Amino acid sequence: MLNKRHKYLQIAFNRSMEEVQSMITLLPPSDRIIIEAGTPFIKRYGVVGISSIKSWWGQKNAGNTYIVADLKVMDRGATEVALVAQAGANAATCLGLAPVETIDEFIKDCAEAGIDSMIDMMNVEFPFEVLQKLKRIPNIVILHRGVDENVNNREKTLPLDQIRRIKGAYNNILISVAGGETTREVMRTFFNDSDIAVVWRSFYENPENTTNLAEDFLKLAK
């Protein structure tokens, strides 16, 4: 599982199976890289896609893999959690906008399946209040500025102010920040004490430049 003393780069993949395989082979080996099977990728390829990503990254990274299945669960996630865990995922996501009962069940299901629970707080105005309502705390909270928000609402900033508040109350929680795509934004993310920075657009738009992009972002994950 993840080390609280480390910073991580999470790369989300949403291209075709063949393209994702090619891009993963271009990644530099690193224990700081997390591979995400993005929601569109999972919808297209299902658990076969997840197990394939696990295999490709394992071959490239000497078996050292951490795979996130971006399920975005909103209701009754038990079956989905079990399926992705069996396929080799190390973590799965549930939306913070889901009912509290659903989030509680999701966290329990992940614990029983032996994988990390990640709660995605996209479009949640007060993430801390969601956490206060839960029976148990997730392993990871994702503070998320969505893709459409990035494109259509440039005034929407990354919710970095939430990081220290959450960490101040929950010592064992990890914070992931999604929605910052430039090296400057990723640097700010880590400066504000996030544990994980999620990127995808640069890799999606420039798959042939995967190696250089990963190396540049990894320099920030110190």
What are these regions (language model features)?
Residues 23-27, 53, 84, 110, ...:
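Generic structural signal for hydrophobic
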Residues 106, 110, 191, 200-222:
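C-terminal helical cap(s) of enzyme catalytic domains, especially alpha/beta-barrels
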Residues 7-13, 33-37, 67-71, 92-94, ...:
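Hydrophobic faces of well-ordered beta-strands that scaffold small-molecule active sites
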Residues 2-9, 76-170:
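Conserved anion-binding
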Residues 29-33, 56-64, 86-91, 111-116, ...:
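Glycine-enriched alpha-helix->loop->beta-strand junction motifs that scaffold or abut catalytic
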Residues 16-27, 75-83, 125-131, 182-187:
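Short, acidic/polar
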Residues 139-203, 211:
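Active-site/ligand-binding-proximal alpha/beta "capping" segment
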Residues 1-78, 136, 211-216:
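Conserved N-terminal beta1-alpha1 strand-loop-helix module at the mouth
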